[in-house]
From Swiss-Prot:
<feature type="modified residue" description="Phosphoserine">
    <location>
        <position position="101"/>
    </location>
</feature>
<dbReference type="GO" id="GO:0008966">
    <property type="term" value="F:phosphoglucosamine mutase activity"/>
</dbReference>
<dbReference type="GO" id="GO:0006048">
    <property type="term" value="P:UDP-N-acetylglucosamine biosynthetic process"/>
</dbReference>
<keyword id="KW-0479">Metal-binding</keyword>
<dbReference type="Pfam" id="PF00408">
    <property type="entry name" value="PGM_PMM_IV"/>
</dbReference>
<keyword id="KW-0413">Isomerase</keyword>
<dbReference type="InterPro" id="IPR005845">
    <property type="entry name" value="A-D-PHexomutase_a/b/a-II"/>
</dbReference>
<dbReference type="InterPro" id="IPR005846">
    <property type="entry name" value="A-D-PHexomutase_a/b/a-III"/>
</dbReference>
<feature type="binding site">
    <location>
        <position position="242"/>
    </location>
    <ligand>
        <name>Mg(2+)</name>
    </ligand>
</feature>
<keyword id="KW-0460">Magnesium</keyword>
<dbReference type="Pfam" id="PF02878">
    <property type="entry name" value="PGM_PMM_I"/>
</dbReference>
<dbReference type="GO" id="GO:0009252">
    <property type="term" value="P:peptidoglycan biosynthetic process"/>
</dbReference>
<dbReference type="InterPro" id="IPR036900">
    <property type="entry name" value="A-D-PHexomutase_C_sf"/>
</dbReference>
<feature type="binding site" description="via phosphate group">
    <location>
        <position position="101"/>
    </location>
    <ligand>
        <name>Mg(2+)</name>
    </ligand>
</feature>
<dbReference type="GO" id="GO:0004615">
    <property type="term" value="F:phosphomannomutase activity"/>
</dbReference>
<dbReference type="InterPro" id="IPR005841">
    <property type="entry name" value="Alpha-D-phosphohexomutase_SF"/>
</dbReference>
<dbReference type="InterPro" id="IPR005844">
    <property type="entry name" value="A-D-PHexomutase_a/b/a-I"/>
</dbReference>
């Protein structure tokens, strides 16, 4: 069965477009019915980021879950990885994060976690989707069996203690000046406080959410403001989270951006030296730079690639027995600690290496020179541009030109009507020509189908 609602990271779309109160309530009902197993009171924890539409969606989800007899524990603004962690620690049957991650405020989404804090499998999502298009009136709870909802206090402290426990007890961030950019999102309270408790000299930006400014010219997708602040304050490092704090990008003391591939290299090498890698390998996606793969090979570390999406990274980690994986966008999964990407915990692992080595971040976090890589998006309204004959011809030509000297990747986005074209190789001019040729053919095919 094709997926009508769920994309690569839950259900996501424009608030009051795809993501309406009606849909959110139905998601609550459907997910509640799927996860009611056994004759006991069932509970769901719900967190959110700082988007204006979060109130609307939260209220609708509460109506849906309580109408099928599930109790609801409301966490308020919390990072996605905190919701996953609290789902497990609070013995909930289900966890929900209301967020569109790195998107701007106009969008929102619903991410679901199972009782152990993992994102749902494709099969469970299909079960929920099937119920979304059914009339559930006859499956609602009796009046005396309706669920209750209440807000939970103290959850920030629980996440802070969890994050601090991922570092050795004798490791302090004393003497480290850190600029943290919380993207005006879910981590705006909890992460600066955690850094302060660890001893860092903390300078915070992106911590004044107003419902509209989440990810706006800030956070991991726009690290320019962080870069300027790091240089201005003569800081040692900058940390940029996205709106729900499941991804992270760093900035060194010179203001240079450190992406997820470099972070994977830093952590992988450190963990290998300390004997902490569960096996001599990590998991990355097809988007990770070939330079990372070559660096890891040079240190005896295998890199296994998956499709784009942290859920696929985690699946491969679990089936293959790996404890480190991630994406260049900054989704870093450390399965010794978390069941999903955790931007803050990943940043802490890098800070630990910096403190251990006593060297500048620019030296610690520049492990390899990335191969020239170009990524372009082609938007389309209708049709299937990838089936066009001219597009197929351009792709074949590109593969031949890069053969043995690079990679070519073309894939539709899982969250929007966009085709992503990525190429990388030793010769930048060739890479540019290949990408431009394919994008031109895709653009013409998309225009013809519109």
């Amino acid at each position: 069965m094709s997926r009508k609602y769920f994309g690569t990271d839950g259900i996501r779309g424009r608030a009051n477009g795809l993501i309406t109160p009606e849909l959110a309530m139905k998601v609550g009902q459907a997910a509640g019915l799927v996860f009611q197993r056994g004759e006991y009171r069932h509970r769901v924890v719900i967190g959110k980021d700082t988007r204006l539409s979060g109130y609307m969606i939260e209220t609708a989800l509460v109506a849906g879950f309580t109408s099928v007899g599930m109790d609801v524990l409301l966490l308020g603004p919390m990072p996605t990885p905190a919701v996953a962690m609290l789902t497990k620690s609070m013995r909930a049957d289900l966890g929900v994060m209301i967020s569109a991650s790195h998107n701007l405020f106009e969008d929102n989404g619903i991410k679901l976690f199972g009782p152990l804090g993992f994102k749902l499998s494709d099969e469970v999502e299909r079960q929920i989707e099937q119920l979304l298009d059914e009339c559930l009136d006859k499956r609602l709870a009796a009046s005396a069996s309706l669920g209750r909802a209440r807000r939970i206090d103290g959850v920030h402290d629980r996440y802070i203690e969890f994050a601090k426990r991922t570092l050795p007890r004798d490791l302090s961030l004393d003497g480290l000046r850190v600029v943290i950019d919380c993207a005006n999102g879910a981590a705006y309270k909890v992460v600066p406080e955690a850094l302060w408790e660890l001893g860092a000299d903390v300078i915070s930006i992106g911590v004044e959410p107003d419902g509209f400014n989440i990810n706006k010219e800030c956070g991991s997708t726009a690290p320019e403001a962080l870069s300027r602040k790091v240089r201005e304050m003569r800081a040692d490092i900058g940390i940029a989270l996205d709106g729900d704090a499941d991804r992270v990008i760093l900035v060194d003391e010179r203001g240079h951006v450190v992406d997820g591939d470099q972070l994977l290299a830093v952590i992988a090498q450190s963990w290998q030296e300390d004997g902490r890698l569960s096996k001599p390998g990590i998991v990355a996606t097809v988007m990770s730079n070939l330079g990372l793969e070559r660096f890891l090979e040079g240190h005896g570390i295998e890199m296994v690639r998956t499709p784009v999406g942290d859920r696929y990274v985690l699946e491969q980690m679990m089936t293959g027995g790996y404890n480190l994986g991630g994406e260049p966008s900054g989704h870093i999964i450390l399965s010794d600690y978390a069941t999903t990407g955790d931007g803050f915990v990943a940043a802490l692992q890098v800070l630990a290496v910096v403190q251990k080595l006593g060297r500048p971040v620019s030296e610690v976090c520049h492990k390899f020179d990335p191969l020239p890589q170009i990524l372009k998006n082609v938007r389309f309204r209708a049709g299937k541009p990838l089936d066009d004959a001219d597009v197929k011809s351009a792709i074949r030509d590109g593969e031949q030109r890069l053969n043995g000297h690079g990679r070519l990747l073309i894939r539709p986005s899982g969250t929007e009507p966009v085709i992503r074209v990525m190429a990388e190789g030793d010769d930048r001019d060739v890479v540019e020509e290949v990408v431009d040729s394919i994008c031109s053919a895709l653009g013409e095919a998309a225009a013809a189908a519109a």
